[in-house]
Every structure is written in C-alpha cells, then in structure tokens.
C-alpha cells in the first residue's frame, strides 16, 4: 500500500458513520464520530475504528479496550525546557513511558499528528515492557507496523493506529512506546503535562532495549496518544476520566502514577470478577467554553469529546470534571456552563455511553497563585451554583461528589489540609480520596445493564 493510498480526506463538518455491534448497537444503528473539520487523517484510522466496534466470531470472548490515553494538544505556543514540542524533533527517537490500566494478549498504538501543521514522517516505531527509566524488559520489544509497513506519513491533523500485534500486556504495566522521526517535525503534537519522565535519543533507537542512547529526559509525551489492548472477557468496557489539570494529575508525584484515574485503575485491576479499563482524558488548563492562548491547554471539551471519549475503544462511561478553569480564568457563570454540560450529556447518550457528573472541587485560597476569579467570592458563588445543579438536576446518569470527598469540613471552600497540593490541586492523598468517592460497582452495573 502506498503512502498516497493511506491518506484520505475528511469532508469538513461531516461526521463518520460507523456500523456497531454489541452494547453500543443497542442504542443506535450508527454512531457519529466527531472529527476535526477540514483535516486529513491516515486511512488506517477508519478501518481500525471499525475494528474497535465490530468483533469477529474468532474474537467473541475478547474486546478491544483503550488501556492508556494522553490527550494530544499542540506544541509551539509555550516554551518549556522540559518539552521541546515548540521546535519539535529532528532525526531523533522519543521513548514515551505509558502506564496501562488493563492487560491483554494483543496491542495496538495510536500515533498522533493531531496538532501538526505539516505531514509527520514516522520512520519506525516500537513497543516494549519497561524495566524502568528508558530501559526495556529483555525479549519484549516489538516493532510496530502500519498497513504492514514500518514507516508512515501522517497528515497534518491526523492520527494513525498501528496494526495489532500479539503481545502479553499485564494490567498496570509500564510500556515504552518509541517513535523515530527521521526529519524535522516542526512544532509537535504533545501531551504537555505527563507527570512522567520520557526520553530522547539521537537517530533511530526504536530497536534499542537499553537506556544508554536516551540521554535526554523530557516531561511530556510526544506523538503518541493512545494504547489499546485486546482484553479478556472480564474487562467489559472502558471508563474515560475526562477533565482538566485535576484529572491530568497536576502536582501528583512524578513517575509514581498517582493521578486519580490511576487510583481507579488500581482498584479495577484488583477486582476478581467483571471489571473495566480506565483512561485519562484530562488536559491541564482545559476549559468548557474557551480555547486558551496557550494551546498546550487543549481545545474545548465539546471540541475534543468525540476524539477523547466517544471514540475510545470499548467506551462505556465517562466521568466529567470540567468547569473550574472557566470560572477562574474567564469568570464564567453557571448559566454559561450548564448548556455545555447538557451538550456533552447528549453526545454521550447518543453514543450509548453513560456519563457521570463530578462536582467541582474547592479552590479557596488559590487566587494568589492563579489570579482571575480563582478562589474569589464571585468564583465561589458560581462553583456552588454549578455543584448544586450537578447534584440535583438529574441530567447525568449519576453524580460523583468530588467536592465532598476533598473539602475541609471546617472550611468547605478549601481543600482539606491533608489533601493540598496547592489551593487548587489535590496531592496524592487527595487524588486517592477522589478515586475512593467513585462507585465503580454502580458504573459497571450500569454498563452491563445496557
């Protein structure tokens, strides 16, 4: 297959209709997938989406589920010495360390040029189990293929899903996804805040299992946006944690996987019976209403909801925690945010997904750090109005009261002192308290009932 044959044009604003089977087909005969208007994507994206929804008879006891996600955002708008996405890479290999939630016997990887301005030439890519740092577990390194080829050109705005390969992946494994970029990429697709050290090496080091060539450490993920596994039949779908920096795990311990979705993954992996995978669709600084000038904060929640939630393999339910940045950064009112929540609820339900509304966590005392209406009386009034609506409207399939889980009973506008990372963000203990507030039994029961 030629490169030209692997590139297709997406008609602006035209949704993609996919045939469904299984749980999602009970809700609709077709599903509209939200794609970036006017973009080009590698055509491997389309058939593999179909693969994610329709299982063959030989695969009847297994289902593809998303096991890791790093929602992609543009580079080039915010210089950081820890993440060279502003200038990109040139004849370098990036080794991304990703922490999966569920295991399986086959794996596939999503590479992303979603925010690229020019086509992205990938010379080669590989996956392996990580043994720590940039080193891999001996004997586990596998090359990735795209339509049978080791290289692929991904159009600007596009993504490419690798061919599935047999590989034993265990729940809670760390995997090394290495991508070689033979030419200059320009400003690069990234996930800016990784809470994970990743690595760069000169030249093509995708086949190297040692850490030696990877002499540079970076703080972001680059060019990889997802990993799926073919899980056994006790993994009944994917739970998507969708949100901003609090979901992204800002101020959690680096390299320790202590974000609240990681804590959910730990609980789900420990279950003896039916369970779920969980992926993190949080983006630091993300908002419901506004694309911020710093594009590493991502596009608005409605803009990216299809890509980061609906289109995830095995998607069954979403936890939505968004809005605090709209209040703090934009002085948004509850009346501004509620229609957006309703839009996302409708999108989830049309796709056959459950969606759970999470109350906004306390931010008292954060104004000195973040300015705006973060922690002001006006901002607090809007937070309370939003939370009252989430709790009482009945619009969501359920409510997760993160506010109650982490607030200080003696001063409920602020985080409990033991949970403070800063006045806006929880620490590891606070993220664990958030995870403890999620009724996983109820979510799993709701998914299985469909």
Task: Describe the function of each predicted region.
Residues 341-349:
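Surface-exposed amphipathic alpha-helices with a cationic face
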Residues 256-259, 263-268, 272-280:
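Phosphate-binding active sites in nucleotide-utilizing proteins
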Residues 1-37:
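N-terminal secretory signal peptides that target proteins for export/translocation
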Residues 43, 55-242, 247-256, 272-273, ...:
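N-terminal secretory targeting modules
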Residues 287, 294, 298, 328, ...:
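Catalytic His-Asp segment of secreted/periplasmic serine-dependent ester chemistry enzymes
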Residues 41-52:
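Bacterial N-terminal signal peptides
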Residues 248, 252, 283-338:
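Oxyanion-hole/transition-state-stabilizing segment in secreted/luminal serine hydrolases
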Residues 238-242, 247, 277-282, 316-321, ...:
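Structural recognition of the beta-strand scaffold that forms the well-ordered cores
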